[in-house]
């Protein structure tokens, strides 16, 4: 879900293939290549295999080159806010709705690093990153179109012929098409996200890292705001009435139109990026053992071996390339064997094996970071899955499969939830500027702990608001189905307040990891890859367990949110007691999120 949000995009949380600050996060090749940042030892080899001179991309081109981030994030915001409610209108029970999110963390963990390695070695005349960005964006367009028209396609394939305004049963053909499109969308998001970040790293000069990261995050924020605004609008069916069909009523046509707008916006952003991102094609002799984007290590043994190998020269942006230069004629003879080994090491299975086996080489203090990170995401992901559904059910007392008034109330609640996510994104953007000074003032450990305590309070507040809302509704103080104004406004405040701890979650853990591994000589990449494991495993657990857990207590979203508050409380306590104390000279490691 980048994914991510934010953020949000997982969108599984998408792990960047290369941090924009080399001093903080040194990413090493999957094959155990040399760390980036080494100086060339052979001037002749540098001249032969590296580009002739360093260059600096203008700020204008950097802004335009990473515009695709806004297009991807637009679709991710719609996915995050609308698709859990929509799948329930197709007849998938609330207890099973969370299962559709399984693909996001899996593809984020396996596909994204592999795509990063493959793009490193891509020899297309159009560059290393742009072919993957193009392919991923086209996949996104196809996937969201499939999702938007799933009800119509199901109708064509044999679902009920009864009008959607009166039919309350299941539409399994439409649901199958929806799930296929949803999983393809997760796969496509992860295909684009990494090469887009790597492209930005390729284009930015040594002194442009901070500004480049800020530009990328700004585009993500723009995409979030536009996407959640689109999801909050209930007028798409009025502006595009031809999208309403016998199988697709108001809520469906609103979603369909929003996704079609997302397609147009993404194609525009992608075209701008592809045009202004001037890549230098990779020569065949340069394609060996590049390490721009692989967040993995083979282990300390490979690091020791790699330290004795020569390194070649500068990349176009002034950074040094970590690919190895043959030191003698024997190296050339071994090229074919090495490439055969790399084909195996670049595979999805090898990615998982490398990360799992490399956990033995984690630096001291990382295990407590992983534990706190896992509990943090066990508390966050139920909210990401069911936030708008909670607003529609518990606050507005709607039902996606109820009578006409109940469905209308549910749709209104979902749109109000999307507006709450819009407010959340605004606060998240503001909070991202406050994280650095807060960490310098109080220390990263305490800031991370406070963010988890804030999530605990907010998740507990959702349970309390649900109880108050149900009590008011049951006491018949309302003669029509809908939300109490005070409860609704309080819910929007909770959505907004969660933006600040979310900005901390998207940045501080990665900076703590960078600080703990700063002197390990390449261990940063290993630790960051394992940190991603502490994100995706909780997402898989929640995807599998949240729906059945809610069903165990009679349905609704309160059980999952209440359990999330327990996890966040535990994460806060462990952060205070177990996290290593770090100096207050905090340095941001960049923005990480769903999108």
From Swiss-Prot:
Residues 1-61, 119-130, 195-213, 278-365, 439-447, 513-525, 578-595 are cytoplasmic. Residues 320-334 have a biased composition (Polar residues). The chain crosses the membrane at residues 62-82, 98-118, 131-151, 174-194, 214-234, 257-277, 366-386, 418-438, 448-468, 492-512, 526-546, 557-577. Residues 83-97, 152-173, 235-256, 387-417, 469-491, 547-556 are extracellular. Widely expressed. Highest expression in sink leaves and lowest in germinating seeds. GO terms for molecular function: sucrose:proton symporter activity. GO terms for biological process: sucrose metabolic process. Pathway: Glycan biosynthesis; sucrose metabolism. It is found in: Cell membrane. Its main location: membrane. It comes from the Eukaryota. InterPro entries: MFS_trans_sf. Residues 29-55, 291-340 are annotated as: Disordered. The keyword Glycoprotein applies. The keyword Transmembrane helix applies. Keywords: Cell membrane, Glycoprotein, Membrane, Sugar transport, Symport, Transmembrane, Transmembrane helix, Transport. This is Sucrose transport protein SUT4. It comes from Oryza sativa subsp. japonica. The lineage of its organism: Eukaryota, Viridiplantae, Streptophyta, Embryophyta, Tracheophyta.
